[in-house]
A protein has these predicted regions:
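Residue-level signal for well-ordered, solvent-exposed loop/turn and beta-edge residues enriched
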Residues: 6, 19-21, 98, 119
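Thiol/disulfide oxidoreductase modules built on the thioredoxin-like
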Residues: 82-87, 94-145
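A generic structural signal for alpha->beta connector loops
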Residues: 10, 62-63, 88-89
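Structural microenvironment flanking redox-active thiols in thiol-disulfide oxidoreductases
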Residues: 46-85, 95-102
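A short beta-strand-turn-helix
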Residues: 11-33
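Hydrophobic beta-strand core positions in alpha/beta domains
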Residues: 34-36, 67, 113
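Short pre-active-site segment immediately N-terminal to redox-active cysteine/selenocysteine motifs
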Residues: 31-33, 37-41, 107
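N-proximal helix/coil linker or "cap" segments that precede and/or mark the start of modular domains
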Residues: 1-14, 79
Length: 147
């Protein structure tokens, strides 16, 4: 992705679980965090979602995980999280897909790893499953946490 090694695009987005609240990307500075782009209409998100739930529940994934609800409506998004569980620290709405476009999203799901300085360090295209987690994401998170 052309954005690897570049600053993550700034955003101010509505919180899906608290619609009166807006979250700014500035709130994530100083943390190593993941942006998981998903949608209720996305078939492969249903494949990926239980794995992310498992990583978070088991404590293997301790970092802040921001779910970017991409080109989707409020009610189906909430229904999806009720049905499949909510692994996210924050769920932010991107109803027009503009933030996703700024990140260079081609399809969902995609997952971005962002370092403490706000730089995009890695991108998983398609579902993040055990292979991607074990080979790429987990070792990178450990390295970035140590920086």
């Amino acid at each position: 992705s052309p954005l690897i090694g570049k600053p993550a695009p700034a955003f101010q987005l509505q919180d899906l679980n608290h619609l009166d609240r807006t979250v700014s990307s500035d709130e994530l500075k100083g943390k190593v965090w993941l942006l998981n782009v998903w949608a209720s209409w996305c078939e492969s998100c249903r494949e990926e979602h239980p794995y992310i739930m498992q990583l978070v529940r088991s404590g293997e994934l301790k970092n802040t995980v921001v779910g970017l609800q991409y080109k989707d409506k409020v009610a189906p998004g909430l229904a999806f999280l009720t049905q499949y569980g909510n692994p996210y620290t924050l769920v932010l709405r991107d109803p027009e897909g503009q933030t996703g476009i700024n990140f260079g999203v081609y399809g969902v799901p995609e997952t971005f790893i962002i370092d403490k300085k706000g730089i995009i360090r890695h991108k998983v295209i398609g579902p993040m499953m055990q292979k991607e987690w074990t080979n790429d994401v987990k070792p990178l998170l450990a390295k970035l946490e140590a920086e």
